[in-house]
């Protein structure tokens, strides 16, 4: 089904990220980082000793649950209300389009706001869209769900930046570790698809799962990234 295809796609992306060889950073910049580290602080010997990197990887996994969760749930709205026009697949491009627009707009405002402030606002507004969709009738519910894409669009770089704070020469290794969080995109849609298709659970439980993802990323943004 569509959930299996989403999971396979996410696994493929994760495999590419795992095996791809990232280019080395500029040598002069690396030397400057090491010199600055000697002057300012003593970095730990391994990236694995920084808890906020692990928390960041899990935040990326949770974000993947949010990003792919909406396309996973949208067909259930048509199943619950056959009177809705068209089909879920006809409206999914609006979700991805909203994410694309959000990324263009977000790139212009990322430099003007603190990462924690912007990410917190996007999480709250995205959660509001998803929550409201559960109570709205007909296409209004669909539009509210699709609107969440605008706020999801800038979360990835913000989570990534918070997970790479104050790592100096260990930044490259940490980025690889955080990228492994994309594996969450391979598992969470499958779980959510199972929940949505279960008559005793359904969309309501899937939305509660998304609120767990929102809550964790919010915690990471304001607390976990500082550890």
Predicted regions mapped to residue ranges:
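Structural signature of the two symmetry-related core transmembrane helices
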Residues: 117-132
